[in-house]
Amino acid sequence: MNSRLWNLEKDYDTLVKWWNQHDFDLPVPKDVLPPLGIIIEEDNVSICAAGLYEDYKRTKFGFMFGLFTNPEIGKIKLYKAMNNCLQEIHKLAKVKELGLVYTITGENALFKLYEKNNMTLVENNTRSYVMNVQQENYNDLRWIMGNDIIETVNK
């Protein structure tokens, strides 16, 4: 398996394809994804990806956004690729001189993977909120909502 920095101009269509295959309500808008990210590939097939936000003022705090996966990949290969992706995010964070990388997940399947990669559970009962500063550009937030919230909004 190989890793590379993602290039949203090239890789965004792949991410959208994965999100559609996973039945996401909407794709994540390209302009809110971080310019930094990692793609794991094998034989020119993208397997998984994660984004890394960093503060342009060089704070020591980063945010890993997503661990997006190709649903056509088998579980064993996918697990290895996700593990590699986390290791590459760690390396990228070191290069960018970040001290901490924060992430959130509601996916039970990722808990053990994160812990195996020395990530520390810091909150177990959290609600996520977004302040929509540009409602004219982001009037539909289903791409960031959990299914339980989407169900209540659609009622």
Give a label for each model feature.
Residues 1-28, 140-155:
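Short amphipathic alpha-helix that is part of the acyltransferase structural core
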Residues 3, 46, 62, 88, ...:
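Generic alpha-helical hydrophobic packing signal
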Residues 22, 26, 92, 96, ...:
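Solvent-exposed amphipathic alpha-helical surface segments
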Residues 26-48:
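A short helix-loop-beta-strand connector motif used in the catalytic cores of GNAT acetyltransferases and
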Residues 30-32, 56, 106:
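A short beta-turn/loop motif at secondary-structure boundaries
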Residues 39, 45-55, 60-66:
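Conserved beta-strand in the GNAT
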Residues 60-118, 124:
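Acyl-donor binding region in acyl/amide transferases
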